[in-house]
Amino acid sequence: MNRVFKSGFVTIIGRPNVGKSTLMNQLIGQKIAITSSKAQTTRNRIQTVYTSEEGQIVFLDTPGINKAKNKLGDYMLMAAERTLNEVDLILWLVEPTTFIGGGEQYIIEKLQNVKTPIFLVINKTDIASEEEVLKAIVAYKDQCNFAEIIPVSALEGNNTDDLVHSIFNYLPEGPMYYDEDTITDQPERQIVAELVREKALRLLSQEIPHGIAVVIERMKNRKGRDIVCLLYTSDAADEGLGV
Protein backbone atom coordinates (compact mmCIF):
# COMPACT_ATOMS: atom_id res chain seq x y z
CA MET A 1 0.00 0.00 0.00
CA ASN A 2 1.42 3.36 -1.04
CA ARG A 3 1.90 5.99 1.66
CA VAL A 4 -0.18 9.15 1.13
CA PHE A 5 2.11 12.09 0.37
CA LYS A 6 0.82 15.40 1.70
CA SER A 7 1.95 18.88 0.77
CA GLY A 8 0.89 22.45 1.24
CA PHE A 9 1.72 26.03 2.15
CA VAL A 10 1.85 27.28 5.73
CA THR A 11 2.27 30.91 6.75
CA ILE A 12 3.76 32.01 10.06
CA ILE A 13 2.29 35.25 11.43
CA GLY A 14 2.46 37.24 14.64
CA ARG A 15 3.54 40.47 16.18
CA PRO A 16 7.15 41.51 15.53
CA ASN A 17 9.79 39.62 17.49
CA VAL A 18 7.66 36.72 18.73
CA GLY A 19 10.05 34.24 17.10
CA LYS A 20 8.63 33.63 13.62
CA SER A 21 12.00 33.47 11.88
CA THR A 22 13.51 31.45 14.74
CA LEU A 23 10.71 28.89 14.44
CA MET A 24 11.12 28.57 10.70
CA ASN A 25 14.89 28.14 11.03
CA GLN A 26 14.33 25.49 13.71
CA LEU A 27 11.81 23.53 11.64
CA ILE A 28 14.03 23.25 8.58
CA GLY A 29 17.22 22.80 10.59
CA GLN A 30 19.13 25.65 8.99
CA LYS A 31 19.41 29.42 9.34
CA ILE A 32 17.64 31.09 6.42
CA ALA A 33 15.53 33.87 7.93
CA ILE A 34 17.37 36.48 9.98
CA THR A 35 16.48 37.37 13.55
CA SER A 36 16.84 40.62 15.47
CA SER A 37 15.34 42.44 18.44
CA LYS A 38 14.23 45.19 16.05
CA ALA A 39 10.64 45.16 14.81
CA GLN A 40 9.93 43.97 11.26
CA THR A 41 13.38 42.53 10.66
CA THR A 42 11.86 40.26 8.00
CA ARG A 43 11.15 42.48 5.00
CA ASN A 44 9.93 40.09 2.33
CA ARG A 45 7.96 36.88 2.22
CA ILE A 46 10.54 34.12 2.57
CA GLN A 47 9.77 30.55 1.52
CA THR A 48 11.51 27.64 3.19
CA VAL A 49 10.85 23.97 2.56
CA TYR A 50 10.54 21.04 4.95
CA THR A 51 10.49 17.60 3.30
CA SER A 52 10.09 14.18 4.89
CA GLU A 53 8.59 10.81 3.98
CA GLU A 54 5.27 12.14 5.24
CA GLY A 55 5.18 15.03 2.81
CA GLN A 56 6.39 18.54 2.08
CA ILE A 57 5.62 21.80 3.89
CA VAL A 58 6.41 25.14 2.29
CA PHE A 59 6.69 27.71 5.08
CA LEU A 60 6.13 31.39 4.39
CA ASP A 61 7.80 33.70 6.92
CA THR A 62 6.17 37.11 6.69
CA PRO A 63 6.91 40.54 8.19
CA GLY A 64 5.28 41.07 11.57
CA ILE A 65 1.62 42.10 11.43
CA ASN A 66 1.10 45.42 13.18
CA LYS A 67 -0.30 48.82 12.28
CA ALA A 68 1.90 50.48 9.67
CA LYS A 69 3.60 53.77 10.51
CA ASN A 70 5.09 54.58 7.10
CA LYS A 71 5.22 53.47 3.45
CA LEU A 72 7.68 50.68 4.22
CA GLY A 73 5.35 49.47 6.96
CA ASP A 74 2.38 49.58 4.57
CA TYR A 75 4.21 47.39 2.06
CA MET A 76 5.35 44.91 4.72
CA LEU A 77 1.84 44.68 6.18
CA MET A 78 0.25 44.04 2.78
CA ALA A 79 2.81 41.28 2.16
CA ALA A 80 1.83 39.62 5.43
CA GLU A 81 -1.94 39.94 4.99
CA ARG A 82 -1.89 38.72 1.40
CA THR A 83 -0.78 35.27 2.45
CA LEU A 84 -3.68 34.58 4.84
CA ASN A 85 -6.16 33.33 2.23
CA GLU A 86 -3.52 31.89 -0.10
CA VAL A 87 -2.25 29.12 2.17
CA ASP A 88 -3.44 25.80 3.58
CA LEU A 89 -2.70 26.63 7.21
CA ILE A 90 -1.86 29.64 9.40
CA LEU A 91 0.45 29.47 12.41
CA TRP A 92 -0.14 32.42 14.73
CA LEU A 93 2.78 32.80 17.13
CA VAL A 94 2.25 34.49 20.49
CA GLU A 95 4.24 34.87 23.70
CA PRO A 96 2.81 33.46 26.94
CA THR A 97 4.06 36.44 28.95
CA THR A 98 2.40 39.08 26.74
CA PHE A 99 -1.16 40.18 27.49
CA ILE A 100 -3.71 40.48 24.69
CA GLY A 101 -3.28 44.13 23.80
CA GLY A 102 -3.90 46.35 20.82
CA GLY A 103 -1.43 44.47 18.63
CA GLU A 104 -3.04 41.11 19.31
CA GLN A 105 -6.54 42.53 18.82
CA TYR A 106 -5.41 43.91 15.47
CA ILE A 107 -4.33 40.42 14.37
CA ILE A 108 -7.56 38.91 15.70
CA GLU A 109 -9.54 41.36 13.54
CA LYS A 110 -7.51 40.34 10.49
CA LEU A 111 -8.22 36.65 11.17
CA GLN A 112 -12.00 36.97 11.66
CA ASN A 113 -12.89 36.58 7.98
CA VAL A 114 -10.16 34.08 7.14
CA LYS A 115 -11.37 30.58 6.24
CA THR A 116 -7.93 29.01 6.46
CA PRO A 117 -7.39 26.74 9.53
CA ILE A 118 -5.43 28.50 12.26
CA PHE A 119 -3.02 27.05 14.82
CA LEU A 120 -2.27 29.11 17.92
CA VAL A 121 1.42 28.44 18.61
CA ILE A 122 2.51 29.63 22.03
CA ASN A 123 6.25 30.23 21.69
CA LYS A 124 9.07 30.82 24.20
CA THR A 125 7.95 28.13 26.63
CA ASP A 126 11.63 27.78 27.59
CA ILE A 127 11.44 31.11 29.45
CA ALA A 128 7.85 30.86 30.69
CA SER A 129 6.40 28.89 33.57
CA GLU A 130 3.77 26.20 33.06
CA GLU A 131 1.29 28.48 34.81
CA GLU A 132 2.01 31.32 32.36
CA VAL A 133 1.51 28.98 29.40
CA LEU A 134 -1.82 27.74 30.79
CA LYS A 135 -2.97 31.32 31.39
CA ALA A 136 -2.11 32.18 27.79
CA ILE A 137 -4.13 29.21 26.51
CA VAL A 138 -7.15 30.31 28.57
CA ALA A 139 -6.79 33.93 27.44
CA TYR A 140 -6.49 33.15 23.72
CA LYS A 141 -8.63 30.05 23.17
CA ASP A 142 -11.91 31.93 22.65
CA GLN A 143 -10.45 34.75 20.55
CA CYS A 144 -10.51 32.70 17.33
CA ASN A 145 -11.75 29.31 16.21
CA PHE A 146 -8.35 27.64 16.53
CA ALA A 147 -7.86 24.24 14.93
CA GLU A 148 -5.05 23.47 17.39
CA ILE A 149 -3.25 25.18 20.29
CA ILE A 150 0.37 24.04 20.58
CA PRO A 151 3.04 25.34 23.01
CA VAL A 152 6.64 25.25 21.68
CA SER A 153 10.10 26.65 22.15
CA ALA A 154 11.37 27.73 18.74
CA LEU A 155 14.79 28.49 20.20
CA GLU A 156 15.33 25.09 21.83
CA GLY A 157 13.11 23.02 19.55
CA ASN A 158 10.80 21.81 22.31
CA ASN A 159 7.58 20.25 20.93
CA THR A 160 8.37 21.29 17.35
CA ASP A 161 8.17 17.66 16.17
CA ASP A 162 4.59 17.51 17.45
CA LEU A 163 3.89 20.78 15.66
CA VAL A 164 5.11 19.37 12.34
CA HIS A 165 3.04 16.20 12.81
CA SER A 166 -0.07 18.29 13.52
CA ILE A 167 0.57 20.43 10.45
CA PHE A 168 0.59 17.36 8.20
CA ASN A 169 -2.78 16.34 9.65
CA TYR A 170 -4.28 19.48 8.10
CA LEU A 171 -2.55 19.39 4.73
CA PRO A 172 -4.13 17.84 1.63
CA GLU A 173 -2.69 15.05 -0.43
CA GLY A 174 -0.49 16.71 -3.00
CA PRO A 175 2.69 16.76 -5.08
CA MET A 176 6.27 17.55 -4.10
CA TYR A 177 6.57 21.22 -5.09
CA TYR A 178 10.35 21.31 -4.64
CA ASP A 179 12.97 18.59 -4.92
CA GLU A 180 13.85 17.00 -1.59
CA ASP A 181 17.19 18.83 -1.28
CA THR A 182 15.66 22.32 -1.59
CA ILE A 183 15.29 24.25 1.67
CA THR A 184 14.51 27.76 0.37
CA ASP A 185 13.53 29.70 -2.72
CA GLN A 186 15.98 32.47 -1.81
CA PRO A 187 19.11 32.79 -4.00
CA GLU A 188 22.45 32.45 -2.22
CA ARG A 189 23.28 36.14 -2.66
CA GLN A 190 20.01 37.13 -0.99
CA ILE A 191 20.69 34.85 1.98
CA VAL A 192 24.18 36.33 2.38
CA ALA A 193 22.81 39.88 2.12
CA GLU A 194 20.25 39.15 4.83
CA LEU A 195 22.89 37.63 7.13
CA VAL A 196 25.01 40.78 6.72
CA ARG A 197 21.95 42.92 7.50
CA GLU A 198 21.31 40.84 10.62
CA LYS A 199 24.87 41.50 11.85
CA ALA A 200 24.53 45.22 11.11
CA LEU A 201 21.27 45.43 13.05
CA ARG A 202 22.83 43.68 16.04
CA LEU A 203 26.25 45.35 16.14
CA LEU A 204 25.02 48.86 15.43
CA SER A 205 21.99 48.42 17.68
CA GLN A 206 20.14 51.74 17.98
CA GLU A 207 22.49 53.71 15.72
CA ILE A 208 21.01 52.45 12.46
CA PRO A 209 17.27 51.88 11.92
CA HIS A 210 15.77 48.74 10.43
CA GLY A 211 15.45 50.84 7.26
CA ILE A 212 18.74 49.39 6.06
CA ALA A 213 19.44 47.46 2.87
CA VAL A 214 22.42 45.36 1.80
CA VAL A 215 23.55 44.86 -1.79
CA ILE A 216 26.16 42.22 -2.63
CA GLU A 217 28.63 43.75 -5.09
CA ARG A 218 30.89 40.73 -5.47
CA MET A 219 30.92 37.20 -4.09
CA LYS A 220 33.53 34.65 -5.17
CA ASN A 221 32.89 30.93 -4.72
CA ARG A 222 36.17 29.72 -3.31
CA LYS A 223 37.70 28.65 -0.02
CA GLY A 224 37.83 31.72 2.20
CA ARG A 225 35.47 33.41 -0.25
CA ASP A 226 35.55 37.17 -0.73
CA ILE A 227 32.32 39.09 -0.27
CA VAL A 228 32.01 42.78 -1.05
CA CYS A 229 28.75 44.45 -0.08
CA LEU A 230 27.24 47.91 0.24
CA LEU A 231 24.96 49.02 3.06
CA TYR A 232 22.27 51.60 2.39
CA THR A 233 20.26 53.45 5.05
CA SER A 234 17.07 55.44 4.74
CA ASP A 235 18.75 58.52 6.26
CA ALA A 236 21.95 60.09 4.96
CA ALA A 237 22.79 61.13 8.54
CA ASP A 238 23.33 57.46 9.41
CA GLU A 239 26.06 56.88 6.82
CA GLY A 240 29.00 57.67 9.08
CA LEU A 241 27.76 55.47 11.91
CA GLY A 242 28.70 52.25 10.16
CA VAL A 243 32.26 53.30 9.33
Show where each model-derived region lies.
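Conserved C-terminal guanine-recognition region of P-loop GTPase G domains, centered on the G4
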Residues: 81-146
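RNA-contacting regions in translation and RNA-metabolism proteins
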Residues: 97, 104, 115, 125, ...
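Canonical P-loop GTPase G-domain recognition
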Residues: 128-182
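C-terminal end of P-loop GTPase domains and the immediately downstream helical coupling element
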Residues: 159-221
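Conserved small/polar residues in nucleotide/adenosyl-binding loops
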Residues: 232-237
